[in-house]
Amino acid sequence: MPLLNSVTTPYAEALLQVVSENDQTEEMVKEVKQLLSLINDSPDLEKTLSSPVLETDTKKKIIIEIFSEKINSSLLNFLKLLADRQRIGIVTSILDRFLEIYRENSNIALATVTSAVELTDDQKGLITKKIINIAGTEKLELVTKIDPSLIGGFVASVGSKVIDASLASQIRKLGLSLSK
């Protein structure tokens, strides 16, 4: 990943600098998350943008057609620039790096919580408080995922720290202790 970061970081930093100067950082963060979600939910779009067969002008037309009404002009121009520079194929990596740099600069930790079922707002609040204490940060961005194989409970990860409070893990531990 360090090689990819050496390509993505300058673009991500440039986008962050432009939106910071225009006082659009928070708005851009929301739009980047929506754009990433849209691209990740549409594998065909990602393949199309990454295709070496399509001409740059065709990719730019596709970008304009799909995104001109959905994102602000700064982000649209950024996507067209990436197409011009033959970097649109790694747009998701660049946008992910943009969010990483934003979180680093804003002292926001990213936590992923996987649970067997959808968490309620109260549960998310309690888990967020626990993770903030463990991570030693004041701000936390919580990403939730659902994995029914956990049976119950949750698995949370922040950086290299993992909290496994899942029922599946407890059953596995019980099975190991009984087999001894």
Swiss-Prot record:
Subcellular location per the Swiss-Prot or TrEMBL entry: Cellular thylakoid membrane
Domain of life: Bacteria
Gene Ontology MF terms: proton-transporting ATP synthase activity, rotational mechanism
A cellular component term, taken from the record's GO annotations: proton-transporting ATP synthase complex
Subunit structure: F-type ATPases have 2 components, F(1) - the catalytic core - and F(0) - the membrane proton channel. F(1) has five subunits: alpha(3), beta(3), gamma(1), delta(1), epsilon(1). CF(0) has four main subunits: a(1), b(1), b'(1) and c(10-14). The alpha and beta chains form an alternating ring which encloses part of the gamma chain. F(1) is attached to F(0) by a central stalk formed by the gamma and epsilon chains, while a peripheral stalk is formed by the delta, b and b' chains.
Family assignment from sequence similarity: Belongs to the ATPase delta chain family.
Function of the protein: F(1)F(0) ATP synthase produces ATP from ADP in the presence of a proton or sodium gradient. F-type ATPases consist of two structural domains, F(1) containing the extramembraneous catalytic core and F(0) containing the membrane proton channel, linked together by a central stalk and a peripheral stalk. During catalysis, ATP synthesis in the catalytic domain of F(1) is coupled via a rotary mechanism of the central stalk subunits to proton translocation.
The protein's name: ATP synthase subunit delta
Native species: Prochlorococcus marinus subsp. pastoris (strain CCMP1986 / NIES-2087 / MED4)
